[in-house]
Amino acid sequence: MTYPLLGRIQAPGDVKRLQESELPALCEEIRQFLIESVSATGGHLSSNLGVVELTVALHRALDLPQDKILFDVGHQCYTHKLLTGRMAGFAELRQKNGLSGFPNPKESPCDTFIAGHGSAALSTAIGIARAKKLKGEPGKVVVIVGDGAFTGGMVYEGMNNVSQLNNLICILNDNKMSISKNVGQMANYLTKLRTDPKYFHVKAQMETALERIPVAGNAMVKVLQGGKQLVRRGIYHSTMFEEMGFQYIGPVDGHDVLLMEQMLTNLQEQFAPIFLHVVTQKGKGLKPAEENPGEFHAVSSIDLSHLTDPELSPKDSFSTVFGSTLAEIGDDVPELCAITAAMKYGTGLNFFKHRHKERFYDVGMAEEHAVSFAAGLASQGLLPTVAIYSTFFQRAYDQIIHDVSLMHLNVLFGVDRAGLVPGDGETHQGIYDPAFFSQIGIPVFAPANYAELKYWLPHLVKDMTGPRAIRYARGNEKEALAALGCTGNLFDKIDTRPGAKVALVSYGAESEEIIAATKLLLQKKVAADAYKLTRIFPLPEGLCEALADYDTILFAEDAIRTGGIGQQLGFALQQAGWQGKYLLHAVDNSHLLHASVAELRKDQNLDAAALAADVLACIK
């Protein structure tokens, strides 16, 4: 497909050269390009399809990079990247050395801030707007906040400190979805704003009448604006956004690009921070994504002619196996509850909801609340499981320590997307959880295949004696690890060679690499055994004794080195009196850029070739 209008945009500001009459066609081209491109490379699809017109209007009304645009969450930035001259880069979207799937100031001066986690961008925008004021710099600061972000508490902390910043515009992208369908009272409140005809018919009539009053000078403008506020509040209730210091405008049609451009242009002269409520449709332009936007939030490369219903998708992954197994356990354990933070599909808990709706809780984009809520349930004798991506558990670390660990409550943490995560880059890596769970004494299990996940999950639920964590990789099990099955042991020797004086040790998905490394070593006439840990903290009883007779031990983990399991094993061996050579391979650069898992492993010397080479160099 050709893109004659989009192809004319080679640099920031080029979109302003198009005629107004060309804008609807441009938006259609952008939407079709995104569908074609993202279906080939993978990426965040449905959210980007929903903000095309809004982003085009912003780029027409603003002057980038003097004006600043922030995204909450950053994955809705694809149209922004197209309009700043990065169309060619989409062929390598989210691939190593290619275009990031999130805003990145290193990639373009038009990318204001990295934003991979939700509810934070308004606070950042307030800081940037305040800095512009202090430094006397011109320009607006615009933050696009998805309605899902309003299920997280941090956005309200920002609203509470907005003050009188007349260079700040907050745009609520209200698509009635975040990643899974929005939940809670905020979602209900926005629905009321969208659907109350009396509220907005009266508002429209009154605004039209007031706009007809002649204006004489800036002083009169301010008087009239104050008068309009009084009339407005006398006829209909003010919104919560106005009560917090914003001038509220909306809801407006976020897919009317001409209306949006006119409105954003008119808002350049403002006397208070603006809250613009824009209604969009997530997944617009792709019928399956419109009907099931959660399924198309983040996609791998897809065949658009063969699409499935996400509610009970048959595709196996660690997430779906976790969710379906937990649902089965719930049949026999009435105390079991399941909690997620706006990631019902991503964590596989849609299966639990289908069978135990009354015990399923989606708390929205509120990880801190999810953990403290689980603590409350556990304190009353229930057995909550909190399933959240590893990268998002970071947001709830205080609650894990203070509300769960100190109380020694029976809470199970399902740590999804643990280890190296492809595509999304530094904001979504799951490399910190082994260190931060173990530092506060929470036992951590790391099944390497589905069989182990299915075995350990019911054991952890039914034998709870305090908090536990079970971590598992993104995607599906690997053939070499699936072949191992499940022994039910806390650690296993998974490969053995007669007379081996070298041992390779790992856990989880990285175990595949040590199996491959033993084969590479054998080609060099070096016999090596391989061990896989299932419980990684505390270290399994008998592990140090099993390793005592080896001259060289290499430990590999796809998590950070400092405070990680490898350092803990090295110390334990030393304390046990072992005096051999200890090699540790772990993640040294904690900010990993977007790439495939294989590329990330190679960059961090966690691939089989690097492990084998280190052993060979050590034993020479």
Regions found by a protein language model. Name each.
Residues G43-S47, F113-H117, G148-T151, D362-E367, ...:
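Alpha-helix N-cap/helix-initiation motif
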Residues V141, V145-G158, G348, F360, ...:
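Extended, hydrophobic alpha-helical segments in both membrane/secreted and soluble proteins
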Residues H297-H306:
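Surface-exposed loop/turn segments flanking beta-strands in extracellular/periplasmic regions
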Residues S39-A40, V51-R60, T124-A129, G152-S163, ...:
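Short alpha-helical segments and helix-capping/turn motifs at coil-helix boundaries
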Residues H44-N166, E335-L336, T340-A341, L349-N350:
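Cofactor-binding active-site loop characterized by glycine-rich and histidine/acidic residues
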Residues E92-T124, L134-P138, Q164-E295, E311-H354, ...:
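Thiamine diphosphate
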Residues T2-L82, E242, D253-V257, H277:
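N-terminal amphipathic, basic-rich helices that act as targeting or association modules
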